[in-house]
């Protein structure tokens, strides 16, 4: 639902000039992210993005509600990448700096696919960890070091128990579809995961 906008222009393959009325630039996002969105014709934020991105950029905890297709992924993904970019700390093996927790593998894959171009353009790394996917590639990526971890609760608990990942460096914890995670009975796992995340970090729901 993230690579959509209320105003789209034809996709560009050459240099991108950000228009003065670009809505994402007006929100205060880093130029590289704004340019990458503009390259795909994404120039005008959806209401949920307008409402949540400024508070998220200011470091506040944010609760956003929206249906599929409302632009929630960009609403939390853009300010999270902006924060990590401003922080500038290097990657540390097994210690991601931001976490997106989602209820299902399918949703995790959607979030990963949506954020991949943005993660790439700011020179960061991300990894999806979920059941039904290779342990070997997931653990290998964590050992090399990533900035953003997208995970389902069960697989993340498993990797925590194996010592393959640590959450002590998480600056932003995002619960995507938190209501669905509760309905699916994941609250004990989510509680345990958040207990491993340092206090004082940012929470986006």
Please report, for each region that a protein language model flagged, where it lies by residue.
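SF2 helicase catalytic motif II
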Residues: 153-205
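Conserved nucleic-acid-binding Ia/Ib motif block in the N-terminal RecA-like helicase ATPase lobe
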Residues: 32-35, 39-42, 91-161, 169-172
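Walker A/P-loop NTP-binding motif
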Residues: 50-62, 73-92, 106-109, 113-118, ...
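Conserved pre-motif I regulatory segment
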Residues: 15-66, 176
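Pre-Walker A (Motif I) flank of P-loop NTPase domains
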Residues: 58-64, 96-98, 146-147, 201-202
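Conserved glycine(s) of the Walker
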Residues: 69-71
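Short, conserved catalytic or interaction motifs in soluble domains
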Residues: 29, 76, 86-89, 113, ...
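Intrinsically disordered, low-complexity accessory regions that flank the conserved helicase/ATPase core
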Residues: 1-21
């Amino acid at each position: 639902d993230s690579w959509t906008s209320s105003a789209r222009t034809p996709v560009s393959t050459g240099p991108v000039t950000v228009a003065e009325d670009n809505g994402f630039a007006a929100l205060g996002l880093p130029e590289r992210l704004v340019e990458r969105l503009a390259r795909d014709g994404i120039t005008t934020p959806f209401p949920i993005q307008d409402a949540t991105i400024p508070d998220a950029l200011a470091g506040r905890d944010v609760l956003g509600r929206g249906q599929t297709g409302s632009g929630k992924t960009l609403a939390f993904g853009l300010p999270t990448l902006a924060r990590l970019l401003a922080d500038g700390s290097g990657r540390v093996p097994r210690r991601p700096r931001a976490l997106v927790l989602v209820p299902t593998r399918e949703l995790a894959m959607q979030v990963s696919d949506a954020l991949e171009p943005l993660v790439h353009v700011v020179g960061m790394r991300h990894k999806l960890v979920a059941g039904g996917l290779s342990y070997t590639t997931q653990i290998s990526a964590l050992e090399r070091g990533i900035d953003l971890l997208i995970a389902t609760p069960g697989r993340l608990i498993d990797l925590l128990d194996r010592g393959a990942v640590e959450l002590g460096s998480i600056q932003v914890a995002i619960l995507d579809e938190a209501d669905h995670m509760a309905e699916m009975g994941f609250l004990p796992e989510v509680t345990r995961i958040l207990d491993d995340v340092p206090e004082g970090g940012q929470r986006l729901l």
